């Protein structure tokens, strides 16, 4: 199974732990191509230096030290490639293939940093199907049979809105994680999926920590236990066994 993910900065800020787990997978049946657009690195740099984000700093350090594993392949977008992709051509193609057209005002108010991301995503998701990469792609990616079916992984609502307008498929980190676990048939995922959904359903409060992780809070009277395997002996302390 081949999974092609375009990962933006918000995914690293809110799902760094998940991505770290993906990078350590060594399942020969699974290949995760992780494409980091120029936008991702620049946005993490901004969060680190301008807003003193500890999570962004950790994310950049993680990317610097990241090495390919059996299942995880990292692909970085270079500035030259992003500059070579025409924004006007991207908008033109989007207008041609969309049932709803964007107004000139809607296009003009898009911040430059998001234009960079949209160019990267549209290039990976749509350009190649239109054979427009011949003058753009100098990395010979066109010959790669795995280079198709790209999906944007994002936690940013603004990015999701723009992705919808530009016909760029997107999913959340949690959804990407579920897809990966389903591909490798992780037993812990299968066993705990129903329990996790029940926790989220019964939670009356959600707290988000600095590292992006979410804590679901439930009432004491509604507390319940995780499912235990039907077979097996219940563990008891050694001291209790000796007394009996």
UniProtKB/Swiss-Prot annotation:
Keyword Transcription regulation attached: no
Gene Ontology annotations for the cellular component aspect, listed alphabetically: cytoplasm
GO biological process terms, semicolon-separated: nuclear-transcribed mRNA catabolic process, nonsense-mediated decay
Superkingdom of this protein's organism: Eukaryota
Keyword Thylakoid: no
Keywords: Cytoplasm, Nonsense-mediated mRNA decay
Function description: Involved in nonsense-mediated decay of mRNAs containing premature stop codons.
Protein name: Nonsense-mediated decay protein 4
Biological source species: Kluyveromyces lactis (strain ATCC 8585 / CBS 2359 / DSM 70799 / NBRC 1267 / NRRL Y-1140 / WM37)
Organism lineage: Eukaryota, Fungi, Dikarya, Ascomycota, Saccharomycotina
The gene coding this protein: NMD4
